[in-house]
């Protein structure tokens, strides 16, 4: 995988399924990948959003997290644009 931003839809996934998906993306993300954009929705509760924040805020590959203004998307920044 080499695009700059990888987008994945986590709608309907459990936290376990989301973790498997995101961990696989983090393993496969190449050096040209800047962000992982994780779409989890804000209308079905905050379980996935909270899980992503708790689990990946201190992950060694993640520089920082960005939560969208509407709360439906979390972006994991793997490296900054230069």
Where are these regions (language model features)?
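Long, charged, low-complexity intrinsically disordered regions
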Residues: 1-82
